[in-house]
């Protein structure tokens, strides 16, 4: 260290305290990075890597790269998006006033979960940091969106605490997680976070101390919030304390904006695991990971970023309380029924910016003049929103009308202080409105050339000296001067200092002119400082009203979400469902909300659904591939979920008994990294469903048992069906799609089981899917016909038909257990061939693969 330059010594000392971060080290107008940070940043940001003197010897060089400080947001955003932490090291004193080395310190550490800059955020979804506590008895998790100030916390206990914890993580999809020692030791939890949720994981053992946590929660949220946390489960406070500790470590600033805390019980929201969210494509599609094609894509007609985040939150957290659901659906209904008010309200909402995140940036001190003007414009637009809400005096819309604070005082202060189109930076002046501050006006006059001041001096000097040809000018040699023609040079006062003789006169300077010149030279610096001082004072005034703005923003967000649901309901001809605790799901002419929009001009065939507490509790659905079984089952699940967020639903009429969870087992794939086959993945998921489901759950099970031999698969499928149907063991409402037609015999044998199939029509050799769900079981799967539709070569289809005819003629029927003593090896071979045909995916096969399959099947047949 002794051989290092003072600046490099300072850098290394600061870097030592921030080893896990890329250090942005402020040097003049640049943020510089050195050593390994420089190499990493150069690679990730496409920067030129150079070197700098490290020590007193010229041979000692260190890698270096840099970026302009005023354009750093974009670079930081790129690093954060890749999961890095960035420590911002600023000069904490004026370099012009520094004695020796300029003092520097870390002002904040930017991480994926603590970022607040708009360049780093998706304005239509929340950005959550979470604290996770897990031990042998309890689990707790807290989520905080720093950009809006909202915090949510919950806790669990018992044997299934880890499963509930994972479901909450899947619900919020945090950008970053701080884990306690117990949580960090849970490998499955880390895999979920890092691999499946793309979440940055931070180990934070020391941050999870109960006494420190309780103290931090009290200081941050107050006594009422502390009282709301469960006393019998400290995991909630521990998770919240770990989160707050990390926030204070990284932000190094006032966090008073984070004041909105919600503790929620496990039973308040419908629970969905990651598999259900993925299979139902709530917010993104499975294949493209895109919004288009998801349920959110259909429902999102919001006009504000706040409304978009609120709608997403509702989709992620469907309600279970009937009264709360009804309040929402009644509000949607009121907007549906008042066309003019709805359309005018939507128009008014479209003029409102992201007030939640604007006030966040103002409080954190990162807002500029443009942010304040945007806030002012949004506040002024509230009057139009309130005008439309005046039509609704009762229900949730009436309450929202009262929750909209006009905020006129804040808008007026911004309007009188800040110009309508301020510059980007608040450090370079030019944004304080004329007439607000006399000194700023005077400095602006000086900066514009001091024309007013020069004119007043010129007039004054003419009157004082009687020299009517006197005029003030400027040149680069000696600055401002007074020019007097030869005919008046005898009247020049003694206070004038001659600087230049001309053919027709003389040029002079005065002390007053020199003072003015000095003012002009320093006016820019003084104006920048004064304007920033005035801006800071205004910012502090706005911060004092932050809670008012937060509450109004929340009301706007909810209103925008309700309006969006109303717009979609009218456009797509949805109905208002009756939501109750009956346990019945009854849907008349239900439609898949996404598929019908994707089809556009094509007609979507609606279907009825009835599932009761006793009758029709389990529906066995048979029919060929591509007929629409999976679409129908997803449709029922999505309509149920939509009803429980308070939305209208795509149906002629609907009655939805509240469900506590929706589980899905649809499709499968090998988990190669985990060393699990398709069948193993399927069985693991089914096991979790049967372990976690309750009698109030809705189960969507597709092709259970297809990944193994026919007998094994059919046995497993039947056992699962029996378990689901048995009210003593589970008794959950279940939609069960299968190609095992033998299972249709369970209707009449198991209470609550009902058979359905997808209607089809044969036209000669062709198959027509009618997409209609009708009572009864299908007699066959039409796999070869589907293979033909998928484009399998004619010779392969013909050969498959012949093989199937031979198998059927060969008596491959497996009699019931009571009719047989032992299954023949011939029957087993034939059954395996049939099973392989059922599992074949012709739409993904090449002709060569199809031929190879046929050869393999032929080998399995008995001689």
Regions inferred by a protein language model and the residue ranges of each:
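Charged catalytic and DNA/RNA-contacting regions of genome-maintenance
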Residues: 1-337, 343, 350-363, 367-459, ...
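ATPase nucleotide-binding head domains, primarily ABC-like/P-loop NTPase cores
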Residues: 35-38, 233, 303-304, 314, ...
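Active-site phosphate-binding and catalytic loops of NTP-dependent enzymes
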Residues: 89, 112-121, 254, 392-396, ...
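Charged, surface-exposed helical/loop "interaction arms" that form contiguous linear patches used
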Residues: 364, 368, 378-381, 399, ...
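Short, amphipathic C-terminal "tail helix"
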Residues: 368-371, 842-863
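Cytosolic, long alpha-helical scaffolding segments
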Residues: 410, 417-418, 424, 480-496
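Extended, charged coiled-coil "arm/hinge" scaffolds of SMC/Rad50-like chromosome-maintenance ATPases
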Residues: 502, 506-540
């Amino acid at each position: 260290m002794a051989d290092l330059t003072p600046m490099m010594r300072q850098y290394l000392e600061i870097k030592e305290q921030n080893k896990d971060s890329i250090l942005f080290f402020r040097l003049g107008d640049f943020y510089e990075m050195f050593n390994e940070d420089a190499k990493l940043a150069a690679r990730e940001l496409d920067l030129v890597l150079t070197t700098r003197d490290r020590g007193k010897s010229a041979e000692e060089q260190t890698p270096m790269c840099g970026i302009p400080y005023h354009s750093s947001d974009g670079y930081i955003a790129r690093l954060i998006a890749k999961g890095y932490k960035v420590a911002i090291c600023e000069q904490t004193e004026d370099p012009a006033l520094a004695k020796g080395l300029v003092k520097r310190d870390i002002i904040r550490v930017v991480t994926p979960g603590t970022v607040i800059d708009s360049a780093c955020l998706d304005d239509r979804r929340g950005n959550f940091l979470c604290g996770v506590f897990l031990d042998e008895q309890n689990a707790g998790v807290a989520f905080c969106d720093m950009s809006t100030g909202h915090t949510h916390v919950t806790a669990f206990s018992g044997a299934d605490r880890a499963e509930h914890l994972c479901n909450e993580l899947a619900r919020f999809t945090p950008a970053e997680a701080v884990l306690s020692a117990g949580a960090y030791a849970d490998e499955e939890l880390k895999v979920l976070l890092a691999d499946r949720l793309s979440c940055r994981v931070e180990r934070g053992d020391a941050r999870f101390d109960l006494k420190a946590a309780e103290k931090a929660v009290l200081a941050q949220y107050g006594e009422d919030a502390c009282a709301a946390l469960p006393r019998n489960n400290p995991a909630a406070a521990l998770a919240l304390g770990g989160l707050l500790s990390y926030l204070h470590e990284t932000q190094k600033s006032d966090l008073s904006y984070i004041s909105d805390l919600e503790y929620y019980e496990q039973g308040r929201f419908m629970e969905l695991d990651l598999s259900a969210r993925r299979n139902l494509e709530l917010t993104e599609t499975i294949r493209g990971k895109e919004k288009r094609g998801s349920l959110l894509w259909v429902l999102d007609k919001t006009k504000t970023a706040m409304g978009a985040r609120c709608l997403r939150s509702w989709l992620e957290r469907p309600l279970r309380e009937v009264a709360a659901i009804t309040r929402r659906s009644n509000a949607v209904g009121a907007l549906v029924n008042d066309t003019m008010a709805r359309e005018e309200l939507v128009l008014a909402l479209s003029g409102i910016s992201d007030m939640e995140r604007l006030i966040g940036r103002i409080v954190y001190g990162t807002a500029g003049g443009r942010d304040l003007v945007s806030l002012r414009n949004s506040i002024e637009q509230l009057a139009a929103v309130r005008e439309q809400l005046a039509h609704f005096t009762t229900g949730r819309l009436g309450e929202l009308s009262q929750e909209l604070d006009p905020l006129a005082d804040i808008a007026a202060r911004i309007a009188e202080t800040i110009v309508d189109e301020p510059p980007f930076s608040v450090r370079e002046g030019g944004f304080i409105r004329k007439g607000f501050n006399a000194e700023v006006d005077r400095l602006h006059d000086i900066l514009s050339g001091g024309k007013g001041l020069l004119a007043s001096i010129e007039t004054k000097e003419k009157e004082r000296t009687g020299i009517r040809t006197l005029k003030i000018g400027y040149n680069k040699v000696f600055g401002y001067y007074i020019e007097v023609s030869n005919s008046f040079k005898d009247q020049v006062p003694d206070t004038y200092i001659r600087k230049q003789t001309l053919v027709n006169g003389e040029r002079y300077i005065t002390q007053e002119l020199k003072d003015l010149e000095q003012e002009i030279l320093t006016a820019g610096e003084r104006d920048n400082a004064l304007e920033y001082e005035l801006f800071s004072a205004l910012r502090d005034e706005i911060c004092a009203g932050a809670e008012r703005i937060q509450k109004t923003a929340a009301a706007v967000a909810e209103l925008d979400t309700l309006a969006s649901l109303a717009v979609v309901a009218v456009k797509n001809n949805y109905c208002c469902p009756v939501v109750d605790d009956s346990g019945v799901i009854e849907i008349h002419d239900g439609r898949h909300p996404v598929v019908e929009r994707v089809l556009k001009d094509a007609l979507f065939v609606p279907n009825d659904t009835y599932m009761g507490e006793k009758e029709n509790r389990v529906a066995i659905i048979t029919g060929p591939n591509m007929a629409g079984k999976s679409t129908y089952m997803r449709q029922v699940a999505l309509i149920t979920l939509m009803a429980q967020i308070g939305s209208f639903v795509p149906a002629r009429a609907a009655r939805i008994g509240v469900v506590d969870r929706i589980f899905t087992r649809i499709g499968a794939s090998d988990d190669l990294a985990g060393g699990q086959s398709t069948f193993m993945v399927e069985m693991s998921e089914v096991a979790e469903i049967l372990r976690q489901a309750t009698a109030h759950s809705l189960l969507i099970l597709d092709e259970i048992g297809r990944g193994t031999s026919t007998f094994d698969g059919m046995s497993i499928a039947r056992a699962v069906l029996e378990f689901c149907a048995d009210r003593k063991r589970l008794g959950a409402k279940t939609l069960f799609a299968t190609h095992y037609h033998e299972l249709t015999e369970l209707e009449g044998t198991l209470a609550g089981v009902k058979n359905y199939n997808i209607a089809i029509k044969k036209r000669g050799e062709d198959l027509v899917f009618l997409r209609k769900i009708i009572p009864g079981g299908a007699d066959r799967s039409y796999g070869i016909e589907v293979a033909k539709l998928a484009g399998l070569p004619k010779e392969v289809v013909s050969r498959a038909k012949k093989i199937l005819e031979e198998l059927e003629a060969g008596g491959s029927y497996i009699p019931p257990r009571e009719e047989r003593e032992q299954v023949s090896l011939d029957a087993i071979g034939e059954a395996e061939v049939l099973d392989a045909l059922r599992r074949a995916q012709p739409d993904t096969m090449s002709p060569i693969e199809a031929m190879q399959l046929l050869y393999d099947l032929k080998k399995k047949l008995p001689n």
